[in-house]
Amino acid sequence: MRVILMTGKGGVGKTSVAAATGLRCAELGHKTLVLSTDPAHSLADSFDLELGHEPRLVKENLWGAELDALMELEGNWGAVKRYITQVLQARGLDGVQAEELAILPGMDEIFGLVRMKRHYDEADYDVLIIDSAPTGTALRLLSLPEVGGWYMRRFYKPLQGMSVALRPLVEPLFRPIAGFSLPDKEVMDAPYEFYEQIEALEKVLTDNTQTSVRLVTNPEKMVLKESLRAHAYLSLYNVSTDLVIANRILPETIDDPFFQRWKSNQQVYKQEIYDNFHPLPVKEAPLFSEEMCGLAALERLKDTLYKDEDPSQVYYKENTINIVQGSNNDYSLELYLPGIPKEQIQLNKTGDELNVRIGNHRRNLVLPQALAALSPAGAKMEDDYLKIRFAEAVKR
């Protein structure tokens, strides 16, 4: 199954682009599902029909759905949420506060992606288009298998079994003192199942032969900067971007003096889009004279963007991690981090793991054996790649 995630700053038009992309894929005979994971859904408005949690046929070969995040959250995390709520209420918090604190930031977004993984496993469609890709919080949760895998396997799994076995013996003594029960098997199983879901999801998202991100942006300073940051963070987590779409460009036919400054600024930032995202391909879409609402309007956007192309193709295979062997038994680990100054990157090697931190984003890379036995011997930024040299430690 081909998976395409549309992302971009709010208001850039990613829902319209997602819907138009779905139209073209369906037109070519691909069974296509456009799934909105944005809490503020607008996919139904874009198609101009009612959509719900389950896929609905829009036209031949095309289905649409708007994810109910609360329903997904309850199905995947309900037992843990109820238990944490019980514990917090026993400590004096009221019901609403306790329920809010029982949900980790980003979990609603991550379970939206878990829903995507379920469609992927069921293989009911040829193309799956996600409207609104993960936020930074949800992306950080994708690093859970690397950061927490060792602890989950060695500590949580044994603790899980021991807790379930001892609960009948300890519960009569524990509850009168604590004011709440010990977690039961359903509660203890949920975190590990969550970890396994994220681990499986990560494998899908980082497979650049099937999954890629489409960045939708506008030729404006703030929007462009946000898009560049998103591209860098996606690269940090090894999620490939294959296409950039510059949307809402003022047509040349507009000659009203009021828009001349806007047009001039757009030309500057449009060129920056091409320069900053090179070598990624860039497509342009104009600001239309009407809202992209309804199939007729989306057909115009579809024809402008793709003409006779198949949008399910992978436009560019972005290699975000490379390992290059040197001539002196040394290696270079190359991480694609576009637009990130070297000064903002922090590195730390512990055992066979390399910790890479950029601001609030962190990734733990498990090093292959050849690199794990060596020590970092320098780093430099070159052509948007952070190149970290590994060599044998100098003996003193």
From Swiss-Prot:
Residues reported to bind ATP: 8-15
E.C. numbers: 7.3.2.7
Annotated Pfam families: ArsA_ATPase, ArsA_HSP20
Keyword Nucleotide-binding applies: yes
Keywords: Arsenical resistance, ATP-binding, Nucleotide-binding, Translocase
Gene3D superfamilies: 2.60.40.790, P-loop containing nucleotide triphosphate hydrolases
Catalytic activity: arsenite(in) + ATP + H2O = arsenite(out) + ADP + phosphate + H(+)
Matches recorded under InterPro entries: Anion-transp_ATPase-like_dom (IPR025723), ArsA_HSP20-like (IPR040612), ATPase_ArsA/GET3 (IPR016300), HSP20-like_chaperone (IPR008978), P-loop_NTPase (IPR027417)
EC supergroup of this enzyme: translocase
GO molecular function: ATP binding; ATP hydrolysis activity; ATPase-coupled arsenite transmembrane transporter activity
Function recorded in the entry: Anion-transporting ATPase. Catalyzes the extrusion of arsenite.
Family assignment from sequence similarity: Belongs to the arsA ATPase family.
NCBIfam families reported in the protein's UniProt record: GET3_arsA_TRC40 (TIGR00345)
Protein name: Putative arsenical pump-driving ATPase
Organism: Synechocystis sp. (strain ATCC 27184 / PCC 6803 / Kazusa)
Phylogenetic placement of the source organism: Bacteria, Bacillati, Cyanobacteriota, Cyanophyceae, Synechococcales
